[in-house]
Amino acid sequence: MAEKKKAKAKGSENKTKATSASVSGFIAAIPDAAKRADAKTLVKMMQEATGEKPKLWGPSIVGFGSHHYVYESGREGDMPVVAFSPRKPALVLYIAATDPPNKPLLAKLGRHATGKGCLYIKKLADVDMTVLETLIAKGVARRA
């Protein structure tokens, strides 16, 4: 019985951690030129918003800063303050955009989709960049 508890506790460890892998190398390896350009733009925007250099979290998330969290369950870990991942179908932004106070901004953003805490954008040309900058800044402020 104790063996199972140990395994379960270890399994609850956060799998996405900051790495020392090269962010510029990761972005340079994005096969789609437009997505690569969008990723470079997001790096600049998020770096300006946080004042932090980008780090690769896990194999495919570019994150800025670090935020320590503790859930009511006792599980805790670290995550980037804001982050994005240039996935094949869309850019995924982890900026707390789906918080209820951001609804009016999302209505002005342009073409996008949302998931649980994520913002999906096919290409930056589809959105209002000023609104996106505001959403990123709000995501940073939320974890300050």
Region roles according to the model:
Residues 1-144:
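Charge-dense, helix-prone N-terminal extensions
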